[in-house]
From Swiss-Prot:
Detected in cartilage and cardiac valves (at protein level). Detected in the laminae fibrosa, spongiosa and ventricularis layers of normal cardiac valves (at protein level). Expression is decreased cardiac valves of patients with valvular heart disease (at protein level). Weakly expressed in chondrosarcoma. One of its GO terms (cellular component) is extracellular region. Residues 242-257 have a biased composition (Polar residues). After cleavage, the post-translationally modified ChM-I is secreted as a glycoprotein. Bifunctional growth regulator that stimulates the growth of cultured chondrocytes in the presence of basic fibroblast growth factor (FGF) but inhibits the growth of cultured vascular endothelial cells. May contribute to the rapid growth of cartilage and vascular invasion prior to the replacement of cartilage by bone during endochondral bone development. Inhibits in vitro tube formation and mobilization of endothelial cells. Plays a role as antiangiogenic factor in cardiac valves to suppress neovascularization. The gene is CNMD. It comes from Homo sapiens. PANTHER family: CHONDROMODULIN-RELATED, LEUKOCYTE CELL-DERIVED CHEMOTAXIN 1. This is Leukocyte cell-derived chemotaxin 1.
Length: 334
């Protein structure tokens, strides 16, 4: 009886006896849980590292933007031109040595970019079919600090700027052919002009001033071109006599203004002399800033003979600061 009770056939084994037939499971229970736990740890480390990198990248980008923006300052003001109030703005970018002036809005907007690094000024009018460039002195714009920003803002913000707009001032007229190679222009001027053709501007004067200049030339030229001996060498002098009505500042042989000594000056230094006032960079006798406007016109009836007959004149304005202010900025006094 005891032998029969110990030996149980496999066919008679019930559901309760299955655990006695299964192999031991303790060997697999210690290996399987380790693999997903390790993956979770690696994933957590990757996520934390990525978050830290993003945080440092955001902080670096913020400080880079803040540092680059510290070299740029914007100010808005109001000017009165012929009894009409117009809004204007000035942007000083000391890092790129640029000044940007905007006047008016909509169809009457005019934008001028003064590139002091290359000695070029770009001008564009809203709705115009041309973009203009003219000679500009080469200089270095001093960095504008926080104290200076407050000084400029207190002088310009919320005030009506006086406008210097003389009838006897220079009038800039576009030449007949656009610029073929614009590689010498900065990216800011090219961005301003876009796809528009670019034309050089040449200086001229109103007819009354031109008559006075011609009278002076007629008195001077005969004494300077007279030669003691007649011959073939006197022909160039006669040629110059035929062109005596052509103002010397309107020569086409040079792209830049020949009366401007700064284009021949190397380096980034700016000399404080009366030409700064003459060229409209700053005002020597002024104690406050003002708005300086220039007329830009299209020729009427062809480009030759001189002097120009012009039409369709529009104004481009900029803010002129006292020369003492610029010198103080260069010396670090303000």
């Amino acid at each position: 009886m005891t032998e029969n009770s110990d030996k149980v056939p496999i066919a008679l084994v019930g559901p309760d006896d299955v655990e006695f037939c299964s192999p031991p499971a303790y060997a697999t229970l210690t290996v399987k849980p380790s693999s997903p736990a390790r993956l979770l740890k690696v994933g957590a480390v990757v996520l934390i590292s990525g978050a830290v990198l993003l945080l440092f990248g955001a902080i670096g980008a913020f400080y880079f933007w803040k540092g680059s923006d510290s070299h740029i300052y914007n100010v808005h003001y109001t000017m009165s031109i012929n009894g009409k109030l117009q809004d204007g703005s000035m942007e000083i970018d000391a890092g790129n040595n640029l000044e940007t002036f905007k006047m008016g809005s909509g169809a009457e907007e005019a934008i001028a970019v003064n590139d002091f690094q290359n000695g070029i000024t770009g001008i564009r009018f809203a709705g115009g079919e041309k973009c203009y460039i003219k000679a500009q002195v080469k200089a270095r714009i001093p960095e504008v600090g926080a104290v200076t920003k407050q000084s400029i803002s207190s002088k310009l913000e919320g005030k009506i700027m006086p406008v210097k707009y003389e009838e006897n001032s220079l009038i800039w007229v576009a030449v007949d052919q656009p610029v073929k190679d614009n590689s010498f222009l900065s990216s800011k001027v090219l961005e301003l002009c876009g796809d528009l053709p670019i034309f050089w501007l040449k200086p001229t004067y109103p007819k009354e001033i031109q008559r006075e200049r011609r009278e002076v030339v007629r008195k001077i030229v005969p004494t300077t071109t007279k030669r003691p001996h007649s011959g073939p060498r006197s022909n160039p002098g006669a040629g110059r006599l035929n062109n005596e009505t052509r103002p010397s500042v309107q020569e086409d042989s040079q792209a830049f203004n020949p009366d401007n000594p700064y284009h021949q000056q190397e380096g980034e230094s700016m000399t404080f002399d009366p030409r700064l006032d003459h060229e409209g960079i700053c005002c020597i006798e002024c104690r406050r800033s003002y708005t300086h406007c220039q007329k830009i016109c299209e020729p009427l009836g062809g480009y030759y003979p001189w002097p120009y007959n012009y039409q369709g004149c529009r104004s481009a304005c900029r803010v002129i600061m006292p020369c003492s202010w610029w010198v103080a900025r260069i010396l670090g006094m303000v």
